[in-house]
């Protein structure tokens, strides 16, 4: 098995390369907050020498309640992304939910994300593939790791091989997620880069009746476990005031803890990738 390397400017995304951080905020709440959060991430990752991609959503189209905040929408969201990219010289990742969003989003962001709930929607997959952008596929909570090959094949047949696979937890009864650590290793056997969404994996879907609950007190433990697998990247969301975040605050890392948190993740990644592989199948 060979590890596919995805090149994003000077950043190399691969399972055997230093991990890349995909981080930011859950949803764009305001231009000023997005700029402030991006600045913090940029400063911390530059200080620690961690390759970094800024993440945020312009529309949370799958909220539990019709009354929940969704975001500024695509037009305004792309303006904010353009300003972040220009100001901090950062690559960007965001998600799309409709086929018409793919082309205009790909003109601004570097990586387009396929949401977990939509990962089997063929028309959306094809529209995303045809942009030529790098694709981040969130593994659906209801699919086994080996079933990701069908989604990969759809992208390949539509002409796109620049694919990242993202683990974000699996359904465990009602209102709960668990993370199958062996499942991430199984996805790595595809050769494609695998990243771990350590904050969304802390969700309790529907756990607060009209919105998702979460377990951010365990954010460090879960991320440490994932990084021990030797992954291409870590996906996290942070907020300066998680209790008042407009989406997924219960899962968000407090922004002021970002530097210490990432120091630990980098130390684990450096250590694990310094080891010679051991083939215990023989």
Swiss-Prot record:
Enzyme class, broadest EC rank: transferase
GO biological process: keto-3-deoxy-D-manno-octulosonic acid biosynthetic process
Localization of this protein: Cytoplasm
UniProt keywords, alphabetically: Cytoplasm, Lipopolysaccharide biosynthesis, Transferase
Catalytic reaction annotation: D-arabinose 5-phosphate + phosphoenolpyruvate + H2O = 3-deoxy-alpha-D-manno-2-octulosonate-8-phosphate + phosphate
Major localization class: cytoplasm
Any one GO molecular function term: 3-deoxy-8-phosphooctulonate synthase activity
Record carries keyword Isomerase: no
Gene Ontology CC: cytoplasm
Superkingdom field: Bacteria
Pathway(s) annotated for this protein in UniProt: Carbohydrate biosynthesis; 3-deoxy-D-manno-octulosonate biosynthesis; 3-deoxy-D-manno-octulosonate from D-ribulose 5-phosphate: step 2/3; Bacterial outer membrane biogenesis; lipopolysaccharide biosynthesis
EC number(s) per entry: 2.5.1.55
Family the UniProt entry places it in: Belongs to the KdsA family.
Name of the molecule in the record: 2-dehydro-3-deoxyphosphooctonate aldolase
Organism: Shewanella sp. (strain W3-18-1)
Encoding gene, per UniProt annotation: kdsA
């Amino acid at each position: 098995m060979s590890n596919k390397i995805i090149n994003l400017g000077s950043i190399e995304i691969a399972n055997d390369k230093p991990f890349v951080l995909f981080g930011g905020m859950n949803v764009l709440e305001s231009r000023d907050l997005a700029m402030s959060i991006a600045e913090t991430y940029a400063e911390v990752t530059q200080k620690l020498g961690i390759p970094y991609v800024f993440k945020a959503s312009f529309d949370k189209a799958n909220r539990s309640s019709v009354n929940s905040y969704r975001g500024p929408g695509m037009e305004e969201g792309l303006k904010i992304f353009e300003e972040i990219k220009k100001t901090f010289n950062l690559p960007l990742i965001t998600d799309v939910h409709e086929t018409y969003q793919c082309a205009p989003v790909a003109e601004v962001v570097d990586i387009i994300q396929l949401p977990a709930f939509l990962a089997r929607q063929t028309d959306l997959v094809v529209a995303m593939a045809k942009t030529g952008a790098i694709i981040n596929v969130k593994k659906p909570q209801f699919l086994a790791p080996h079933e990701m090959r069908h989604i990969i094949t759809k992208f390949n047949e539509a002409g796109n091989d620049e694919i990242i696979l993202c683990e974000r937890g699996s359904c465990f009864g009602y209102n709960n997620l668990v993370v199958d650590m062996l499942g991430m290793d199984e996805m790595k056997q595809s050769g494609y880069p695998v990243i771990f969404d350590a904050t969304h994996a802390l969700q309790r879907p529907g756990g607060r009746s009209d919105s998702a609950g979460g377990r951010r007190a365990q954010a460090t433990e879960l991320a440490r476990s994932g990084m021990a697998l030797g992954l291409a990247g870590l996906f996290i969301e942070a907020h300066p005031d998680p209790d008042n975040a407009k989406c997924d605050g219960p899962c968000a890392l407090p922004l002021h803890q970002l530097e210490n948190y990432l120091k630990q993740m980098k130390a684990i990644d450096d250590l694990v990738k310094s080891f010679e592989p051991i083939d215990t199948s023989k």
